[in-house]
C-alpha cells in the first residue's frame, strides 16, 4: 500500500455498488470533493446516501468504477491509514465505562491531556465537563446515562477532534438534539469542520443549507447538485423535498 498523508480530496469515478448479490444500490456515481469542501448528500431513505459514507472508509469494495483519495485509488491505501484520517460522527454516540478523558482519547496514549482539553474546548464540551465533580476524571457509565443527549454529542465531537482527521463524515449528526443544545451543537460542528473535507448525510434540510455543495440522490443515482440556492432555483427534486419539509414543520 502507498504511504500517504491524506489531504482529503475525494473522487468517485463511475462507481457501481451492491451489497452481496443484491441489486445495485449505487449506479454510475461520479463526483469530486476538493480538500476542505463541505458536501451534503440528501434524498429519500434507500437512495444510497449512507452507502457512499461506508465506501469512503472502504468498509465494502465496489463492483465497478474507482474511488480515489488525493488521486490515489482507495485500494492502494493502507486501510488503517485511510480510516485514521476519517473522523466519523454518528447519531448514536457510544459512551464507555470509565472517565470523561478516556471517552475522548479512547485510551490512545499518543493523545495528551493537553490535547484532550483543547479538543473539548474547541467544541464547547468543556462547558459541562468542568462543572462535573472531578472534571475530566469524572466517572461515566456505559450508556452515559448521567449525560444528556446534547452532552454526549459534544463529547463525541471532542473525541473526533482529538484524532485530528482530515476527512469528516457526519451521518445525521444533529438528529436527536433538544433546541437548547442545538445552537451549541451547530457552533461546535462549524468549528469541527473548519479546514476539513466534510461529508454529511442529513434528513433535515435545515442542517445542511450552508454546505458548499448539495448532491441529491434518487434510487442510487445523482439527480442534481449545486448550492442550496442553485438547487431551489432549478425547481427539481431538491425543491420538492424542501417544500415537503416546510409543510411538515
How would you name each of these model-derived features?
Residues 3-249:
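ABC-type nucleotide-binding domain
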